[in-house]
Amino acid sequence: MMRIGNNSQGIWQLFSRMNGNNAFGRSSGAGGRNTLEDQLTGHRKNSYGVEGMCVTNNPNARKIIKVSDEMKQRVFNSVKDAYYKYNGMSGDNEAEWEEMAQAKNNYYKTLKKEDRVAAAWTLGQLEISTGRKVANAVKEKVPGWTHGKPIPSDVLDEIFADESITSMVSGKSGTVEGLDIQV
C-alpha cells in the first residue's frame, strides 16, 4: 500500500528528472505553451508564444489601430487568393493557413504587448471588410453567384484592379475611417 504523500513525491521526482531541477518546466524552450510560472505571473501566451493576446476583460480587444502596410497587403493577398483559388471560400490548404498565422504572430511580437490584440482585431476586420466588398462586387457582375461557385478570372481581375478594393490596403485602411466594419 502506497500513501498519497509518497506518490506525490514520486511524481515530483519524475517531473524533476524530465525538466532538470525545475519540476514544472521553467524552460524557455516551452514553445508557445504557458508554463506554470507564466500562469502565476499573468504572462499568458497564445499557441504561437505571443503574450498580450487574451481578449477576456481586455479593453483593446475590439479596438482598431494602425497596422503596417506589409501586413495589410498580406491580408489583402490572402483574400485575393481565396477568391482566385477557392471561389471566395477559405480553402483547405493547411500550409497556407499556418504560414499566414506565423506571419501575423511574428508581426504581433514586434508590437507593444498592449497593442497586439488590437492589431489582431484590426487585421481580422480588414479581412472581413475586404471579403465583403469583393463578394458584393462579384454578385453585381455575376448575378446569382454565391461563395464557392466559380468566378470568371477576368471578373476577378477587374474587381481586384478597382481602386475601391485596392485602396483598402493603402491610405486610411487599418484605421477606423478606412474600414467598413459591422460589429
Place the predicted regions along the sequence by residue:
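Type III/flagellar secretion export determinants
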Residues: 1-183
